[in-house]
């Protein structure tokens, strides 16, 4: 597994505003969308392309286009939905799948409650969207499901990560073609499994379900 922390002043600026408890849901959604696009730029650095011949208004030349099969973008429900627009803004021709995961707040274990994606992901580059890499259980379970379906190149785009989650992924997904792209690796998890300093519950803050 490879970890890439994006170091950019705009990323740091938007992340700081997301962390602020005074930021309302509408602003939170907008900033999360903008931040995802910045992270997506780095996450797609190795997106597969193929050579193509074209004619400009002046002459013939050679360029590149995205290869087939098209990349697959998979937001993890529900908070991952708030990251979808920011990702497909850079990959408008990508296919979109959905993966519903829920975490037991007592055991912190993740389980699947819904899937909608191709059964065969052989040869596909897959981009998984989840705001928080906290304990790591949700992302590990999600990526295992994708690899089971044949995905051979998985990139997880997360706004924030905790060291504990990164360590779990490195241990559980050792030797797999997985990259994690994030704006920050924070200090730690608290006893409730939240990232510290973090930004709270990303889903609740996006959709206004809780303070």
Curated annotation (Swiss-Prot):
Any binding details for the cofactor? Binds 1 Mg(2+) ion per subunit. The magnesium is bound as Mg-PRPP.
Q: Which CDD domains match?
A: PRTases_typeI
Q: In what way is its activity controlled?
A: Allosterically activated by GTP.
Is the keyword Disulfide bond in the record? no
EC number(s) on file: 2.4.2.9
Biological process terms from the Gene Ontology for this record are: UMP salvage; uracil salvage
Under what name is this protein listed? Uracil phosphoribosyltransferase
Pfam families, per the entry: UPRTase
The cofactor named in the record is: Mg(2+)
Per its UniProt record, what PANTHER family does this chain match?
Answer: ADENINE PHOSPHORIBOSYLTRANSFERASE, URACIL PHOSPHORIBOSYLTRANSFERASE, CHLOROPLASTIC
Q: InterPro entries recorded for this chain?
A: PRibTrfase_dom, PRTase-like, Upp_B, UPRTase/APRTase, Ura_phspho_trans
Q: Which gene encodes it?
A: upp
Residues bound to uracil are: 195, 200-202
The GO terms this record gives for MF are: adenine phosphoribosyltransferase activity; GTP binding; magnesium ion binding; uracil phosphoribosyltransferase activity
Pathway info: Pyrimidine metabolism; UMP biosynthesis via salvage pathway; UMP from uracil: step 1/1
Q: Which domain of life is it from?
A: Bacteria
Biological role: Catalyzes the conversion of uracil and 5-phospho-alpha-D-ribose 1-diphosphate (PRPP) to UMP and diphosphate.
HAMAP family, sorted = Upp_B (MF_01218_B)
Give the record's family classification.
Belongs to the UPRTase family.
